[in-house]
Amino acid sequence: MAFSGCQAPYLSPAVPFSGTIQGGLQDGFQITVNGAVLSCSGTRFAVDFQTGFSGNDIAFHFNPRFEDGGYVVCNTRQKGTWGPEERKMHMPFQKGMPFDLCFLVQSSDFKVMVNGSLFVQYFHRVPFHRVDTISVNGSVQLSYISFQNPRAVPVQPAFSTVPFSQPVCFPPRPRGRRQKPPSVRPANPAPITQTVIHTVQSASGQMFSQTPAIPPMMYPHPAYPMPFITTIPGGLYPSKSIILSGTVLPSAQRFHINLCSGSHIAFHMNPRFDENAVVRNTQINNSWGSEERSLPRKMPFVRGQSFSVWILCEAHCLKVAVDGQHVFEYYHRLRNLPTINKLEVGGDIQLTHVQT
């Protein structure tokens, strides 16, 4: 099966879940499953890479079991019959805790990373290119399932016509004096694990639809403290998206996500737990504009819990979703979108994942 580019993630899918892997698996393909193990029900969960939705042909069955001290079963099912189990007598997951589970498809095997560390490799028993479906079931809650094919090289259109995606890099923290918004507290420094992935094509079950644009880029899993700063090559343009995931610290007061244009902050998103608000604003020439605070429902972030933020750029505004739910729109105050080319994240969170 020919792979037609990367596909957009499934956001906050209900479990049990089955979804299409567009174009099927290819050598070098990477799938990330982000979520949390439920603390009060069930003793198992499973991630299956299979052909079709019947479950009779599963190329790779990854099955953590919180029994007998905890272990993980790997297996293959062909025509309804299971093969011999491979067991890893170690449990990298904890009940009630978030996880980042990454599957890397290689010519000979699947390599499985849990929270940034290599956990197991599973040698193919059937041709992996037959796989066109991913399923998740059991005692987990999902934040997202994302996809990346680092070998896909779609053509980059002009700004006026391009739908989205952009690679990311890690420049040094910029110098200079910038007026900070009142009472934005610094982050508690903590090492983190991050994966940077491109996901750029529409699929059913997502909030926003997308099509390929710029070649995806993949980075290793460095550990570094907050704040996190990176360039956005090409800047913003209609249909470009940015996705960030992390965990709010238990004692969090505030954190912020900034999209910057030179010394200006085109978009400042500032969840404030001390005010039970999500403040949005723009800073031009070191001067803050009028705040926007309205929300359609309660505060979407919770202390001590994981989150996923999706920022979608459109011609007139930014659309923002939290955990798969649309929460607000922010109309552009700086309209030269391609100059908005830097992302800054800081405050009382642990950042775990960035997709651009």
Curated annotation (Swiss-Prot):
Pfam families: Gal-bind_lectin
UniProt cross-references to Gene3D superfamilies, sorted A to Z: 2.60.120.200
CDD domains membership: GLECT
Domain Galectin: 17-148, 228-356
SMART domains for this protein: Gal-bind_lectin (SM00908), GLECT (SM00276)
Keywords annotated in UniProt: Lectin, Repeat
Keyword NAD set for record: no
Residue sites binding a beta-D-galactoside 2 per the record: 288-294
Annotated GO CC locations: cytosol; nucleus
Annotated spans, Disordered: 170-190
Entry keyword Repeat: yes
Top-level division of the source organism's lineage: Eukaryota
Gene Ontology BP terms: negative regulation of CD4-positive, alpha-beta T cell proliferation; negative regulation of type II interferon production; positive regulation of gene expression
Role description: Binds galactosides.
Note: The LGALS9-like proteins are encoded by a duplicated regions on chromosome 17; there are at least 3 genes coding for galectin-9-like proteins.
Protein name (database record): Galectin-9C
UniProt organism field: Homo sapiens (Human)
Organism ancestry: Eukaryota, Metazoa, Chordata, Craniata, Vertebrata
